[in-house]
Curated annotation (Swiss-Prot):
Signal sequence, renumbered to the chain: none
Keyword terms, alphabetized: Cytoplasm, GTP-binding, Initiation factor, Nucleotide-binding, Protein biosynthesis
Record CDD domains: IF2_eIF5B, IF2_mtIF2_II, mtIF2_IVc
Pfam families associated with the record: EF-G_D2, GTP_EFTU, GTP_EFTU_D2, IF-2, IF2_N
Ranges where the record places region G4: 362-365
Positions of region (G2): 287-291
GO function terms (MF aspect): GTP binding; GTPase activity; translation initiation factor activity
Positions with biased composition (Basic and acidic residues): 83-96, 151-167
UniProt entry tagged with the keyword Calcium: no
Listed name of the protein: Translation initiation factor IF-2
A GO term from the CC aspect: cytosol
Amino acid sequence: MAKERIYELAKELKMPSKDLVNMANRQGMGVKSHMSSVTPDQAQQLRQLAKGGQKTTNNQHQPVKKNDGHNKQNNHQAQNHNQHHDHDKTQNERPQKKNNSRSNNGTKDNNQHQNNGGRFGGSLNNDQGRNGKRFNKKNKKNKKHNKNKRLREVAHKQPTQRKDKPLPEVLEYTDGMNAQDLGKILHRSPAEIVKKLFMLGVMINQNQSLDKDTIELLATDYGIEAKEKVQVDVSDIDKMFEDEQNNTEHQVTRPAVVTVMGHVDHGKTTLLDKLRHSHVTEHEAGGITQEIGAYQVHYNDQLITFLDTPGHAAFTEMRARGANITDITVLVVAADDGVMPQTVEAIHHAQAAQTPIIVAVNKIDKPGANPDRVTEELAKYNLIPEDWGGDTIFVKISAKFGKNLDELLDMILLQAEMLELKANPDQNAAGSVVEARLDQGRGSVATVLVQQGTLHVGDPIVVGNTFGRVRTMTNENGRRIKEATPSTPVEITGLNEVPEAGDRFVVFDDEKTARAAGEERAKRAMDKERQKTSHVTLDNLFATMKKGQMKTLPIIIKADVQGSVEALSQSLQKIKVDGVRVDIIHQAVGAINQSDVTLAEASNAVIIGFNVRPTAVAKTLADSNSIDIRLHRVIYDAIEEVEDAMKGMLEPVYKEETIGQVEVRQIYKASKVGTIAGGMVTSGKITRDAKVRLVRDGVVIYEGELGSLKRFKDDVKEVKQGYECGLTIENYNDIKEMDVIEAYKMKEVPVK
């Protein structure tokens, strides 16, 4: 049988719970309060004790009644006092417990009233004067006791019944919850949780964090299942972006996103303008005004999104930040010029992004155009047309006259159909930033491309390391719109700060979560800036290989002549150590420029220069981004250095430290001295004991030592930036105006 509560048993016996608690404790039952439980045997024992006590109490009332009858024969003064006393008892009736305690002394009290009857026989004024204070205290005591009695009677008549909400079927918890958190989930008070755990042998307070085992123990005691909730990092928008991308429910076909790339003056801008005006204006009444660097073209009842990127560097920067928003790359090559250096760069960037390439051979209307030569040159870069057995689409066009543009659009739609581009428009929007700027009138303005879901005005959004709410949204024509579907470029406002091109964005359900995610990402970005992650270098290559972090070593080769490029490339590709191979991602002739450094940063590559030097901008960019540039004049030294680095055998080496540059402004001839170069120190300083290198058009001509260094006919030890000087190079006279003389020192650097 089930246990019974003390207060329920007291209600049944019509006696105060406190009296029943005292009675149970006298029997050694160890009852603490009216909420304590007793066994059925103990309850029966208490019932018998309570009934026996009530019989005794009733019998004890009989002598009192007899005494009351006998007292009626007393004198008139005592009789008056008894009447007054009975009236007071009627108004202030005492509980049964008090009557029982006083019933044994009833006769004695009445006798005292008889013996002291003369004392009460005085006047009313005397009664109030001598005994008024005593009766007032007695009345107050009676009133207080009666109030408690009424409260107990109400409690006995209407006992408090706690109506708990039903327990959940599964307790979903996270490690570290306290009693208050669990109470909200279980629909129980924190005090009950603490008491329950106390009964289970766990001493806690309401604010103390609980471990996984304790929470599961509590759930087992309640008879429900416990399941740990997986905490999602709301600031990890990259994972959220991937989850949105991988959501295959309710997917529909979306427009293709196309980027047009090519060499300068090959007609890229003309092609974009022709497509925009011929296929957009017919759908826009009154013409258009291009507002952003992205637009959509209507063709054959389908949409194609074109991105007008400012250059290859921007394309690579976006890919370096993880944004691969391009589906198809259109490579524009002029039929009269053929493949040019920027054409090769565009090919390498597109191949690194793993996007299909459609070749648009432009300017076929010009005299001297030779499309077949373009096809032959592109075949060297694995761009083989379908006519030759390859899989690359070639289209011969004339952007100036609009010839075969429809065929180009047909090929884009065909390629998009083969790619099966789909997106879910019914989920939260996610996408990437194409470009961003700070507008004085509107604040932070960002051009974004929606890749998944539908973006609405008013959506809470996190973009890169900033957040906000979409305040306004305009299309490429400057017209305000309320929503943007997948593959639609729009310009939005409402962000707290200006994001960077290539940053991803994700829409959240509420602004509070978006704010928390944005602030956390900004904090992490600041911490990451303080502890910048270094790129791979030949010094740390072997340690990186041992950790299993590298399977290939990406290398960019720049040399003074094509023969050196090919020889160095072939030799490096033959090196293979412990399953790690060399991957030549770009090779070209000329000085190391900014584009090479940008590509190295995006691909985590090492740049090897043979008889060439980096430009000033490229060197600054490489230093700021920790890009490893290795310069050599002997091809075998370059090969040996890479091989030793892969084998982990690099010894401490002397590293070159450039201390200054001098630009030659004027040349003087002296019969005894030779050629004297007069110039300006453009950066750093030049010292008398420094080694020098003569660079002409980015190519190293000579390396040696200074013969002399003078300023105003005086020999000096050094000349700083911004001052003119005269110098000679020992045993070398072939110096020309506009040459650059680099001063450097060799510094011993241990291998890291």
